[in-house]
Amino acid sequence: MRKLKRWQIPFFAFASFGPCMLSTIISVYLVDALQTAGFGANLEQWTFAGKTIVAVGLFSVMKAISSLMDGLVEVPVATFVQNLKTPWGRRRPAILVGTIVMTLAYVLFCFPISYEENSAANSIWCGILLTVFVSFFTLAINALFGTYAEITANDDDRLLLTNIKAAFDTIQYSIAYALIPVFIGFGINIRQIGLYMAPLSLTILFAVFLIKENSTMPGAVAKYGDNVGATVEEETVSMMDGIKMSLGNEAFRAWLIIHGCFNLGLQMFLSGQNVLISGPMGLNGFQIAIINSSAFAPVPLMLIFYRKVMAKKGYRFAFQTALASFALGMVCMSLAYVRLFPDAMIRMALGATGGVICSYGIGAFFSAPTAMPTQIAADEKKRTGKSHPSMYFAMQGIVNSLVSAIGPGLIWVNLRNVSLNGNDMFGTHAMTYIVIAFCVLAIFACKLLPKEYDQLGRKEKAAKK
């Protein structure tokens, strides 16, 4: 594979912007838009029809199945991509097919079969489309992220790529969490907004045009890399060998535990954020935009601060501080509760304060899930000569799928319907405390990382070398 030039890295980092935006919108907004539970202000705009058009129990099962299916296809997809034989290489065909199918499923999700209340047909229809979406999103993104370790020339370029991607992730989430509530406040329905966003999947074309990979067909001659003109020798890796290789890495095993802990809480929060702010916090579209802007606007600066902490204290300590900041921000948001503070200005101030505190953790959360598997895969290639980055992302993806099935899929879908003593927003408000608990668990799980992660990223170490 031809290495990226320095000026090409920002464009390559931007490639995942559109597909990830669609994934955020469908998981955070469109799935919630099928039912009314937990919403307060702007109910007609936040939902497809101002009423619950799915059978909640059945749809929660279908949503959990979609998350589990996503996990089940992770490893087969990684193996398929790793061993794909085409004249255009392994990555580009997988990226294109995955993006086209996921975009079609996304658009169809915006068109329920009917607008009847508690519809079983809608539950099945939307559940199937959600399964198709997440499966082919996995194919496209696994193939794309699998190039990160191979398409960069050195560790500095790799770090630059993941940092720029984290910055684009910040913009993506700012649009999703800050601007979309503004559009809702203007009276635009979430279904329309979702359809307007669909063409963003075209950003994947940056990767399609920038990836220059040798043919993987038998007997093909290399056009790129260190052996131009020689016959391409592609290593075939079985599914079991790929699993053993990834799970045999001590640092990666520890990372999976950490990632699973904090990501369960994070996904619950991101999936239910609009319901939390609209319901228990009792804020409207413009106020929601302020809260979300306070959480995402400072992220680029917080990433710089995060890197400074890492340069002084190492990766483990820096990531623990990020987890602690997110938990503290959740405490502030839990206090911004209509039953505690009837004054909307006080609630908005508490929510904005919590958002700013959370932004430090958000910056780290954007960077780490791409940086860690990429770096581990690159280190493995240096150590063993074998390159199987897709499998690391696949195993991390399985953890993502499991926590999605447990957190947003089962806990959140049902928790938001829990009431206590006539308080219909009790379950939605309780979500903040669950997020805090999982952040604390992740802080302790960081101790499982190998000792060298106390030194990873420290400038003193680099200076000695």
Model-derived regions: residue spans:
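Membrane-embedded alpha-helical bundles of multi-pass transporters/translocases
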Residues: 2-465
